[in-house]
Amino acid sequence: MGYHSVFIAVFLWSSMVCHNGLAMMDDGKLTSSSGPPNYDYADALAKAILFFEGQRSGKLPSSQRVKWREDSALSDGKLQNVNLMGGYYDAGDNVKFGWPMAFSTSLLSWAAVEYESEISSVNQLGYLQSAIRWGADFMLRAHTSPTTLYTQVGDGNADHNCWERPEDMDTPRTVYKIDANSPGTEVAAEYAAALSAASIVFKKIDAKYSSTLLSHSKSLFDFADKNRGSYSGSCPFYCSYSGYQDELLWAAAWLYKASGESKYLSYIISNQGWSQTVSEFSWDNKFVGAQTLLTEEFYGGKKDLAKIKTDAESFICAVMPGSNSRQIKTTPGGLLFTRDSSNLQYTTSSTMVLFIFSRILNRNHINGINCGSSHFTASQIRGFAKTQVEYILGKNPMKMSYMVGFGSKYPKQLHHRGSSIPSIKVHPAKVGCNAGLSDYYNSANPNPNTHVGAIVGGPDSNDRFNDARSDYSHAEPTTYINAAFVASISALLAKT
């Protein structure tokens, strides 16, 4: 993963983007008390999910709640005679990157599966299902044949050199695809994971749709496995650095959970030698996601998965303070800090794993795990995860929320095109490439559209945050930061 941080920096430099937008919701609620801050987790969850409506591409539905957005990119794929409308803009730009979009959909689906009752209890399950479906529908359209998958819409270089609203952008909508001749196992397998996870979400409420999702997932997994080749050879942005074995295990784990078919478990057992001990969970590295899912199977009696369970424990040991094998340090203020490029993506995903892993231990009446001479109970793991959520919501040295629209102090200059340029509804005149840069990107004013729920890249290793639109490493939100946070905030609505 040595090249990972370099890639992120180069990518974000070229993107010069930031998400933000005005939604019709109240400000985040934070009540003071003599003790620690008492955060309104239900409100934070609602806003974390609402963020995805501000990232939508395509024809917006009548139920759209983020009112500063309008229809956009309605001709995506038209020149190739394929309908690639819909899906999500990745971060602060107007490009649809399929791989991180699929990962975000996987995480949202995992949250819906793991915390269905908690999310439903605060009336957010329907909104979450809509967010999942928006991503899944795009992936279904992008899978046009058993061995053809569209993976990106938009010219990253051209888009990142401009600063335009998605509603009137005029940069090329170039499409990219993988097939048997130019494979991308990582992406095909991630699409498979996302669709199989989503199939579980919809199984009880739309059986036909769930079946369609699972069918495409199986086909995509076969494509990924039988036409192995790294996406690093077929991608312009979001290239793979960790290889494709993690995605194959991740997809097989979800397919086993969704279908119950023993062939997927056999595949995992036969290939569990691929499993590695890791210290991050990200759009590029899914090992601990698969390991966590399969740890549940181990405790359920699948003892052949012992190596994978041990590898999952190694991740916990790598991030827990006080662990003898700790690899990820915390800032002076207590935030897990993996690297200084959109660090909160790693914090939210690690926190998600910590919460779910602790829940698995409780469900299976396991006392805890050992990290050398250190022992951590499920309660201790959950307790540390909670500190990460609280840090993001405001319990930090900057005394600010890193979620836009939550609390009284939060980022106002999100690195996000649509948020930083007046809505087309109030400023219908076209904002061109250079005008966007000079008039809005370089502006010292707050973004005119408050992108409620957007979580930015976060502070530096010393807990400092510069609220500047140009600081893409810290001021830009992404779909996968929010997707992981949905599970983490949902966990705090649960008792264990």
Swiss-Prot record:
Top-level enzyme category: hydrolase
Superkingdom of origin organism: Eukaryota
A molecular-function term among this protein's GO annotations: cellulase activity
Record-listed E.C. numbers: 3.2.1.4
Signal sequence annotation: 1-23
Active site positions: 93 (nucleophile), 415, 467, 476
InterPro entries: 6-hairpin_glycosidase_sf, 6hp_glycosidase-like_sf, Glyco_hydro_9, Glyco_hydro_9_Asp/Glu_AS, Glyco_hydro_9_His_AS
Transmembrane segments: none
Reactions the enzyme catalyzes: Endohydrolysis of (1->4)-beta-D-glucosidic linkages in cellulose, lichenin and cereal beta-D-glucans
BP term (GO), one: fruit ripening
Keywords: Carbohydrate metabolism, Cellulose degradation, Fruit ripening, Glycosidase, Hydrolase, Polysaccharide degradation, Signal
Function (record text): Involved in ripening fruit process.
Annotated family: Belongs to the glycosyl hydrolase 9 (cellulase E) family.
Name of this protein: Endoglucanase
